[in-house]
Amino acid sequence: MATASFNMQSVFAGGLTTRKINTNKLFSAGSFPNLKRNYPVGVRCMAEGGPTNEDSSPAPSTSAAQPLPKSPSPPPPMKPKVSTKFSDLLAFSGPAPERINGRLAMVGFVAALAVELSKGENVLAQISDGGVSWFLGTTAILTLASLVPLFKGISVESKSKGIMTSDAELWNGRFAMLGLVALAFTEFVKGGTLV
């Protein structure tokens, strides 16, 4: 017990600078070509309006050191151009599918609850009583209304200000999708309307 304690104390007592760990013996740079250093080529720099001859040497300055003029700030980075191709907009990772489905779910959830409160019908009864035509019409209108700005190159993030941001719309749409499925499932299990 005492020797184990002494060994542990000797490991922790020595500073990190006293122990050398040589990783070059474990891994040589030749066996890993990506670890070799690439030494950069020398680069010359000239001030604007300065001498252009290579032979000219700067004149010794007799006055105090003057501050160098500030270089102009770099231009802001260019925003990537938004693709307006139909296949890019409706791609799985594109800007349209989740937003369109979320908008449809928000409208559908509110409409399902409104009809349930007014007529007392559950979601499955609403669909069988002519809800399919309402669903198809709403889907066509909201899809076209969502795609028109995207075809013009307007991104969703550019129009989000205040509390109505694009992230809030995404999350509201996700919750509405879950809510609509949960409403239909609950009414199916319960056998009647939720409210």
UniProtKB/Swiss-Prot annotation:
Q: What does this protein do?
A: Prevents excess accumulation of free chlorophyll by inhibiting the entire chlorophyll biosynthesis pathway (e.g. 5-aminolevulinate synthesis and Mg-protoporphyrin IX chelatase activity), and hence prevent photooxidative stress. Probably involved in the integration of pigments into the mature light-harvesting pigment-protein complexes. Light-harvesting chlorophyll (LHC) a/b-binding protein required to ensure a high rate of chlorophyll accumulation during deetiolation in continuous high light. Involved in seed germination. May fulfill a photoprotective functions.
Ranges annotated as biased composition (Pro residues): 69-79
Transit peptide segment: 1-46
Please identify the protein, giving its name as recorded: Early light-induced protein 1, chloroplastic
- Topological category with respect to the lipid bilayer: Multi-pass membrane protein
The source's domain of life comes to Eukaryota
Pfam families in alphabetical order: Chloroa_b-bind
The segment annotated Disordered runs over 46-81
Q: Which UniProt keywords apply?
A: Chloroplast, Membrane, Photosynthesis, Photosystem I, Photosystem II, Plastid, Thylakoid, Transit peptide, Transmembrane, Transmembrane helix
Indicate, by first and last residue, each region the UniProt record lists as having compositional bias (Low complexity): 56-68
Source species, please?
Arabidopsis thaliana
Cellular compartments annotated:
Plastid, Chloroplast thylakoid membrane
Q: Upon deletion of the gene, what happens? A: Reduced greening during deetiolation in continuous high light, with a reduced ratio between chlorophylls a and especially at the highest irradiances. Slight reduction in the rate of chlorophyll accumulation during greening at moderate light intensities, and lower zeaxanthin accumulation in high light conditions. Normal sensitivity to photoinhibition and photooxidation. Impaired seed germination, especially in high light conditions and at warm to hot temperatures (greater than 22 degrees Celsius).
Mention one GO biological process in which this protein takes part, according to its record: cellular response to UV-A
Q: Which SUPFAM superfamilies match?
A: Chlorophyll a-b binding protein (SSF103511)
What is stated as this protein's family in its record? Belongs to the ELIP/psbS family.
Induction summary: Levels increase linearly with increasing light intensities and correlate with the degree of photoinactivation and photodamage of PSII reaction centers (at protein level). Induced by high-intensity light, at both cold and warm temperatures (e.g. 4 and 22 degrees Celsius) (at protein level); quickly and transiently induced during deetiolation, and accumulates in green seedlings following increases in light intensity. Induced by UV-A, red, far-red and blue lights illumination in a phytochrome A and phytochrome B-dependent manner; this induction is promoted by HY5.
A GO CC term attached to the entry: chloroplast thylakoid membrane
Q: Where, by residue number, does the polypeptide cross the bilayer?
A: 104-124, 131-151, 175-195
